[in-house]
């Protein structure tokens, strides 16, 4: 077996402190929902630019090179 060090004991106590526990209530659901909505908006904008249904002045989409 290896030696026990103070740093190893500290890191082990920090790393295993929340293992198997569930945060009561909503937890991180609102944050993840907000990030999901931002991702959805980003993907819709990219799709509209690709389909040229979102017209931007001074920005031409030419896929032929």
From Swiss-Prot:
Known role: One of the components of the core complex of photosystem II (PSII), required for its stability and/or assembly. PSII is a light-driven water:plastoquinone oxidoreductase that uses light energy to abstract electrons from H(2)O, generating O(2) and a proton gradient subsequently used for ATP formation. It consists of a core antenna complex that captures photons, and an electron transfer chain that converts photonic excitation into a charge separation.
Q: Which domain of life does the protein's organism represent?
A: Bacteria
Is Transmembrane one of the keywords UniProt gives this record?
A: yes
What does the subunit section of this Swiss-Prot or TrEMBL entry state? PSII is composed of 1 copy each of membrane proteins PsbA, PsbB, PsbC, PsbD, PsbE, PsbF, PsbH, PsbI, PsbJ, PsbK, PsbL, PsbM, PsbT, PsbX, PsbY, Psb30/Ycf12, peripheral proteins PsbO, CyanoQ (PsbQ), PsbU, PsbV and a large number of cofactors. It forms dimeric complexes.
- Any transmembrane segments, and where? 27-47
Q: What is its main location?
A: membrane
Subcellular location(s) per record: Cellular thylakoid membrane
Q: What is this protein called?
A: Photosystem II reaction center protein H
State whether keyword ATP-binding applies: no
For this chain, the family text in UniProt reads:
Belongs to the PsbH family.
| Protein's membrane topology | Single-pass membrane protein
User: Any one cellular component term from GO for this entry?
Assistant: photosystem II
UniProt GO BP: photosynthesis; protein stabilization
Which keywords does the record carry? Membrane, Photosynthesis, Photosystem II, Thylakoid, Transmembrane, Transmembrane helix
In the UniProt record, the signal sequence range is none
One Gene Ontology MF term: phosphate ion binding
SUPFAM superfamilies to which the protein is assigned, alphabetical: Photosystem II 10 kDa phosphoprotein PsbH
């Amino acid at each position: 077996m290896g030696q026990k060090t103070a740093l190893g004991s500290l890191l082990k106590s920090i790393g295993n402190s929340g293992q198997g526990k569930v945060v009561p209530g909503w937890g991180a659901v609102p944050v993840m929902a907000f990030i999901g909505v931002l991702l959805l908006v980003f993907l819709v904008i990219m799709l509209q630019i690709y389909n040229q249904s979102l017209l931007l002045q001074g920005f031409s989409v030419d896929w032929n090179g």
